[in-house]
Amino acid sequence: IGTQIVXNXMKSIKNIQKITKAMKMV
């Protein structure tokens, strides 16, 4: 269960980083 939570957190962090990069580009 713990590993799934970590994986989900990593995915969410990557998504947030993509959004922040897109915002910076604009």
Curated annotation (Swiss-Prot):
Keyword set, alphabetical order: ATP synthesis, CF(1), Hydrogen ion transport, Ion transport, Membrane, Mitochondrion, Mitochondrion inner membrane, Transport
One Gene Ontology CC term in the entry: mitochondrial inner membrane
Subcellular location: Mitochondrion; Mitochondrion inner membrane
Membrane topology listed for this record: Peripheral membrane protein
Alphabetized InterPro entries for the sequence: ATP_synth_F1_ATPase_gsu (IPR035968)
GO molecular-function terms, A-Z: proton-transporting ATP synthase activity, rotational mechanism
Disulfide bond residue pairs: none
Domain of life of the native organism: Eukaryota
SUBUNIT field: F-type ATPases have 2 components, CF(1) - the catalytic core - and CF(0) - the membrane proton channel. CF(1) has five subunits: alpha(3), beta(3), gamma(1), delta(1), epsilon(1). CF(0) has three main subunits: a, b and c.
Function: Mitochondrial membrane ATP synthase (F(1)F(0) ATP synthase or Complex V) produces ATP from ADP in the presence of a proton gradient across the membrane which is generated by electron transport complexes of the respiratory chain. F-type ATPases consist of two structural domains, F(1) - containing the extramembraneous catalytic core, and F(0) - containing the membrane proton channel, linked together by a central stalk and a peripheral stalk. During catalysis, ATP synthesis in the catalytic domain of F(1) is coupled via a rotary mechanism of the central stalk subunits to proton translocation.
Family: Belongs to the ATPase gamma chain family.
Protein's UniProt name: ATP synthase subunit gamma, mitochondrial
Species for this entry: Spinacia oleracea
Lineage per the UniProt record: Eukaryota, Viridiplantae, Streptophyta, Embryophyta, Tracheophyta
